[in-house]
């Protein structure tokens, strides 16, 4: 009887071990098979894929998730992709993130810090050619202004806010000879360099990136105005992703710099820091104020 009980116990233990082995293998297979789509809007004419590739590869290696990138051409498309469930993770500008948080269940979780900088914030610059007759910010009245794209934070929203401070508006025909959207920060700057615009409003990140890759030389231009600090363009994920997976993705992004060279929105990054939704309340107030002033 004792031998019979021992055999039964051994059989039970073997079956239990087998069950746990199967469950463990199944759990691992599930984790490895999880796939997420990441959407981004190129910040420049350079394409930007290389800025994201290294970071994504490291995140994939750490989490064992598969991340597929989707490039779209405008900010609204990036929001719509997450709202419709076609994208799970996104690189957004600050203003676009506010919209995505409102209608697409987006949640900001990280932002890149550029090499040599102390935080992830950046600025909107107003740039003119070196020999321009525009000497101070108020001199832009009556001139040709180029901006990035409608919906851009540092290439549309913040320039409008800064102009409002000196009682100018892009929608008032008396304030500018013309205002046009060039389609990217790079194109906005090139419009000035090629005499298509007198002044451009653009991201400080793209200004520095194009200076670094010799698209232009510092002596060709002047910065006539710099905005207050702008909250950084965040990486955001959909709240529809299970919490445990969101935590894995966030932790991997925050640790990524330890595993190799990484990039992000606007070029090379030294590392990523944690951000939260309330960090963008200042932009929400700016958007509300601008709407109020226009109404």
Predicted segments, located by residue:
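Bacterial N-terminal signal peptides that target proteins for export
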Residues: 8-17
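A ligand-binding cleft/hinge motif common to bilobed small-molecule-binding domains
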Residues: 91-104, 159-165, 191-194, 198-219
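Periplasmic-binding protein-like
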Residues: 36-41, 110, 115-125, 215-253, ...
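Short helices/loops that flank or line small-molecule/ion binding pockets
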Residues: 76-90, 103, 121-122, 138, ...
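Short, Lys/Arg-enriched N-terminal segments with co-localized hydrophobic residues
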Residues: 1-9
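Ligand-binding clefts/hinges and TM-proximal coupling segments of bilobed small-molecule sensing domains
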Residues: 66, 144-162, 251-295
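Bacterial N-terminal signal peptides
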Residues: 17-25
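Bilobed "Venus flytrap"/periplasmic-binding protein-like clamshell domains
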Residues: 33-34, 38-60, 72, 95, ...
């Amino acid at each position: 009887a004792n031998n019979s009980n021992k055999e039964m116990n051994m059989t039970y233990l073997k079956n239990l071990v087998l069950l746990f082995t199967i469950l463990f293998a199944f759990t691992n297979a599930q984790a490895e098979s999880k796939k997420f789509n990441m959407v981004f809007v190129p910040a420049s004419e350079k394409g930007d894929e290389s800025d994201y590739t290294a970071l994504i590869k490291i995140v994939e290696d750490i989490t064992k998730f598969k991340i597929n990138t989707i490039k779209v051409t405008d900010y609204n498309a990036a929001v719509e992709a997450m709202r419709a469930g076609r994208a799970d993770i996104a690189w957004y500008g600050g203003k676009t993130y506010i919209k995505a948080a409102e209608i697409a269940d987006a949640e900001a979780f990280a932002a890149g810090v550029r090499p040599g900088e102390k935080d992830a914030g950046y600025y909107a610059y107003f740039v003119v050619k070196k020999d321009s007759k525009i000497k101070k910010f108020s001199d832009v009245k009556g001139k040709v202004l180029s901006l990035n794209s409608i919906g851009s934070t540092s290439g549309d929203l913040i320039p409008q806010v800064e102009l409002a401070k000196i009682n100018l508006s892009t929608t008032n025909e008396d304030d500018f000879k013309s205002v046009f959207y060039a389609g990217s920060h790079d194109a906005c700057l090139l419009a000035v360099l090629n005499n298509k615009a007198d002044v451009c409003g653009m991201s400080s990140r793209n200004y520095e990136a194009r200076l670094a890759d010799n698209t232009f030389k510092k002596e060709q231009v002047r910065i006539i105005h710099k905005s207050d600090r702008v909250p950084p363009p965040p990486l955001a994920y959909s709240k529809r992703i299970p919490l445990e997976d969101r935590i894995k993705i966030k932790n991997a992004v925050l640790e990524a710099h330890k595993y190799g060279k990484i990039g992000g929105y606007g070029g090379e990054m030294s590392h990523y820091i944690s951000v939260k939704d309330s960090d963008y309340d200042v932009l929400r107030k700016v958007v509300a104020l601008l709407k109020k002033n226009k109404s």
